[in-house]
């Protein structure tokens, strides 16, 4: 059948040629429903959704950002060292990561750092958050939600004081979600020298206008270093510690 005759037939059936073509193109694209407009696998029904369901009730971290954590954490399982999260809040992303570690790499430990009483003093010139923000949490509640017993090591207190005694630690993956300039700098000064080659640091707040101090701290720390932050459209930034990185 010629294209002209097919067009007339479709017209009689009430189907416009453009709509038919669009439908055919969509059918030819695997997982077409996940293009919104770009491929967005965190909307799918795969394994990630099971882990994200653990995070969702108790986190402000969106599905696309959790998918970044999930994907990079899996890739860090073969790297020497443990997993750190600085800025736990109500424990949503901690619960997701603890479950993933328990299932895939139970030899690793998840270190969790937070005041569990809200933010410390902030820098008024660099930060929009203020002391006491995110105080609606408590260590006991978070620990009960995250679970996984000895796999999780909770360190309550201010950063960097809560890092005391961990100088010999090796780190494979770190999630830094503390929002404010000085705390992020303090995290980096301690974590970066202990991050194993091939390891990742994910900064949750880098690209958000609500956290200008986050980007300022990250950019300042990595200025002149061979490793540079990769800014993602999720608002996060990722730094990979390459083979030659100091």
Segments and roles (model prediction):
Residues 35-63, 70, 77-246:
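S-adenosylmethionine/decaboxylated-SAM
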């Amino acid at each position: 059948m010629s294209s002209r005759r097919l067009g007339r037939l479709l017209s009689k059936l009430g189907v416009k040629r453009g709509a038919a073509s669009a439908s055919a193109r969509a059918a030819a694209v695997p997982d077409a429903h996940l293009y919104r407009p770009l491929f967005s696998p965190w909307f799918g029904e795969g394994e990630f959704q099971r882990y994200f369901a653990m995070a969702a009730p108790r986190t402000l971290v969106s599905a696309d950002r959790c998918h970044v954590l999930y994907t990079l954490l899996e890739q860090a399982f073969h790297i020497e060292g443990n997993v750190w999260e600085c800025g736990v809040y109500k424990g949503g992303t901690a619960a997701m990561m603890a479950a993933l570690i328990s299932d895939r790499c139970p030899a690793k430990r998840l270190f969790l750092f937070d005041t569990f009483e809200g933010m410390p003093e902030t820098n008024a010139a660099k930060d929009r958050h203020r002391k006491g923000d995110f105080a609606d949490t408590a260590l006991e509640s978070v620990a009960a939600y995250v679970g996984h017993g000895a796999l999780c090591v909770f360190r309550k207190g201010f950063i960097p004081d809560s890092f005391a005694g961990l100088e010999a630690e090796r780190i494979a993956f770190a999630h830094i979600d503390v929002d404010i300039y000085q705390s992020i700098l303090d995290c980096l000064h301690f974590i970066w020298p202990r991050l194993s080659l091939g390891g990742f640091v994910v900064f949750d707040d880098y690209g958000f206008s609500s956290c200008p101090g986050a980007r300022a701290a990250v950019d300042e720390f990595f200025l002149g270093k061979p490793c540079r932050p990769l800014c993602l459209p999720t608002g996060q930034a990722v730094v990979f510690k390459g083979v030659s990185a100091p």
